[in-house]
């Protein structure tokens, strides 16, 4: 098992990673001061059916534990479910000493975290991720819900008390969720750990390799990349934006195709390839785009759909949170491990995206 210490300006906490991590949950709760009055577990239907009782049983405490379960899927990260969770919290008499446990993937972590951030102006919460993708979202304190006009547009910065990454929970994931989460692992390697990138190319030949000790190794290498960036810039005023590598186009694809019709990781994978494609043009460097594309395709990541309107995608990219006064800002790569936020004119993005779309179709 590997423990990772997270330090930000507002809070310090630990991430417990391993096959026995759930055993720490009771101690985490018992050590909280002031003492926890009661616990609300927020989960989704798919995860709750598999793991909710396991977590309840692991909480060997006297306090009342109850659950709030929403349907599964990114579209459920909505104001309606956010409001309903508050109603449930009030009905079950949560107070300022209560604790919320986010049991699920990134959608649940975002939803439950924002409920915790806003209920009575902020109460404590613990992340219990059940997906590989959540190795990214569970750490760092960004919590949010979606708006019909944009992803993660309503939210806050609210750090958890701890993250309990019980790796056996991941074994029930379908392949598309392994692939989705692995995209964020690749992202962390490309922007902050070149040694990890080379290790992935050698050791992860198929998604089936993301198991057991290799999985724990990946998590204990990828999470510190994010932790180091968050320690420098907790509220995304500077270098934390580097974590959005691949996300400008990725989020646009999610919005255009409809949340749930493409996984977050698949969108980010296409977005990273486009960022590398554009970076080669902007910086006049060779980043081995063609080799990278074949590596991504080996894992089953999609190509950019040929029937999507480039003009519409550019419009959606202008709504990205990094955009400033309607100008697209993208995270581009100078070399592996070195990225920057760059202002890109609409016309440049449009021309590059058309060429990228054509390249993905023809090759």
Curated annotation (Swiss-Prot):
Binding annotation for Zn(2+): 184, 247, 264
Binding site for NAD(+): 72-77, 130-131, 142, 151
Record-linked Gene3D superfamilies: 3.40.50.1970, Dehydroquinate synthase-like - alpha domain
Subcellular location: Cytoplasm
Key word NADP present: no
Record keyword DNA damage present: no
Biological or metabolic pathway of the protein: Metabolic intermediate biosynthesis; chorismate biosynthesis; chorismate from D-erythrose 4-phosphate and phosphoenolpyruvate: step 2/7
Catalytic activity: 7-phospho-2-dehydro-3-deoxy-D-arabino-heptonate = 3-dehydroquinate + phosphate
GO MF annotation list: 3-dehydroquinate synthase activity; metal ion binding; nucleotide binding
EC number(s) given by UniProt: 4.2.3.4
BP GO annotations: amino acid biosynthetic process; aromatic amino acid family biosynthetic process; chorismate biosynthetic process
Co-factor binding comment: Binds 1 divalent metal cation per subunit. Can use either Co(2+) or Zn(2+).
Cofactor(s) listed in the protein's UniProt record: Co(2+); Zn(2+); NAD(+)
Function of the protein: Catalyzes the conversion of 3-deoxy-D-arabino-heptulosonate 7-phosphate (DAHP) to dehydroquinate (DHQ).
Family, similarity comment: Belongs to the sugar phosphate cyclases superfamily. Dehydroquinate synthase family.
UniProt cross-references to PANTHER family, sorted A to Z: 3-DEHYDROQUINATE SYNTHASE, 3-DEHYDROQUINATE SYNTHASE, CHLOROPLASTIC
Protein known as: 3-dehydroquinate synthase
Organism per entry: Bacillus thuringiensis subsp. konkukian (strain 97-27)
Source species taxonomy: Bacteria, Bacillati, Bacillota, Bacilli, Bacillales
Gene name tied to this protein: aroB
């Amino acid at each position: 098992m590997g423990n990772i210490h997270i330090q930000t300006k507002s809070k310090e906490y630990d991430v417990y990673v391993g096959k026995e991590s759930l055993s720490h949950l009771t101690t985490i709760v018992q050590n909280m001061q002031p003492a926890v009055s009661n616990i609300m577990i927020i989960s989704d239907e798919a995860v709750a059916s598999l793991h909710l009782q396991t977590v309840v049983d692991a909480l060997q405490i006297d306090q009342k534990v109850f659950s709030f379960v929403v349907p599964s899927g990114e579209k459920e990260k909505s104001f309606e479910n956010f409001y309903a969770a508050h109603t449930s919290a009030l009905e079950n008499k949560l107070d300022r000493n209560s604790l919320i446990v986010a049991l699920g993937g990134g959608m649940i972590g975002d939803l439950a975290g924002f409920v915790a951030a806003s209920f009575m102006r902020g109460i404590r919460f613990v992340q219990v991720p059940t997906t590989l993708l959540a190795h990214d979202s569970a750490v760092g304190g960004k919590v949010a819900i979606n708006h019909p006009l944009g992803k993660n547009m309503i939210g806050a910065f609210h750090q958890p008390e701890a993250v309990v990454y019980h790796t056996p929970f991941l074994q029930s994931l379908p392949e598309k969720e392994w692939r989705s989460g692995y995209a964020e692992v690749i992202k962390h390697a490309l922007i902050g750990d070149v040694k990890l990138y080379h290790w992935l190319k050698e050791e992860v030949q198929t998604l089936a390799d993301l198991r057991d000790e290799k999985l724990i190794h990946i998590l204990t290498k990828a999470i510190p990349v994010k932790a180091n960036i968050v320690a420098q810039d907790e509220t995304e005023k500077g270098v934390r934006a580097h974590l959005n590598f691949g996300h400008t186009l990725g989020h646009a694809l999610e919005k255009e195709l409809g949340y749930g019709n493409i996984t977050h990781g698949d969108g980010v994978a296409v977005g990273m390839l486009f960022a590398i494609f554009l970076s080669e043009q902007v910086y006049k460097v060779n980043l081995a785009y063609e080799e990278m594309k074949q590596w991504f395709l080996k894992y089953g990541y999609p190509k950019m759909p040929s029937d999507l309107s480039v003009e519409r995608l550019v419009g959606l990219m202008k709504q990205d949170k990094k955009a400033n006064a309607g100008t697209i800002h993208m995270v581009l790569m100078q070399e592996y491990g070195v990225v920057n936020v760059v202002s890109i004119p609409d016309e440049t993005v449009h021309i590059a995206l058309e060429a990228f779309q054509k390249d993905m179709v023809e090759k």
